[in-house]
């Protein structure tokens, strides 16, 4: 410390007004760890911030989900299989902007810009051909609305005689993030909220 006051050297204050203690321990008390540790939120409870199951990741480790972003459904299908062969444990499909917006590939400004173009049910059949979705979880971020992609995946699985209830994974959407990112939505926000609530 070289003669400097302990409080000025050991306690760091950020410009937001947060003071960092020099060390945090379980015995520090309410002035430190009690403020930063969650008290009412555990895995499988509350807002599920710490996981959807009580055991968290103890029983099932985190998945390895390399994003597959080939433009054509057949190429993306081959890449999905390749990633599983190379150690991925989750099918992770990235769709292009036009697909996320529900625009036909023929009318798209930049088809395949960030992922696979899926316009029709046949495209989804090609994309999911030979994938063991009852064994390996499936992941897709669908932009503002997941309803269309969810319907296409479910229809494809049913057509192949698969039990949709045995499929694990997520076809997610985040209309707020899309609104912030692009400044507009292709559907009313209220409709998207209702869709997510169902």
What are these regions, as identified by a protein language model?
Residues 1-198:
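Catalytic alpha/beta active-site cores
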């Amino acid at each position: 410390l070289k003669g400097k006051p302990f409080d000025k050297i050991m306690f760091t204050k950020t410009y937001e007004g947060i003071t960092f203690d020099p060390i945090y321990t379980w015995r520090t008390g309410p002035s430190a760890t009690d403020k930063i540790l969650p008290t009412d939120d555990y895995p499988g409870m509350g807002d599920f911030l710490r996981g959807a199951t009580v055991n968290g990741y103890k029983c099932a480790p985190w998945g390895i989900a390399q994003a597959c972003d080939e433009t054509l459904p057949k190429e993306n299908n081959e890449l999905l299989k390749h990633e599983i062969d190379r150690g991925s444990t989750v099918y992770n499909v990235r769709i292009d902007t036009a697909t996320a917006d529900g625009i036909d590939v023929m009318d798209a400004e930049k088809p395949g810009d960030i992922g696979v173009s899926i316009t029709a049910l046949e495209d989804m059949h090609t994309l999911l051909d030979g994938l063991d979705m009852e064994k390996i979880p499936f992941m897709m971020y669908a932009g503002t609305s997941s309803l269309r992609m969810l319907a296409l995946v479910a229809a494809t699985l049913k057509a192949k005689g698969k039990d949709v209830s045995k499929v694990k994974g997520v076809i997610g959407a985040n209309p707020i993030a899309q609104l912030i990112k692009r400044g507009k939505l292709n559907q009313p926000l209220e409709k998207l909220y209702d869709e997510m609530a169902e």
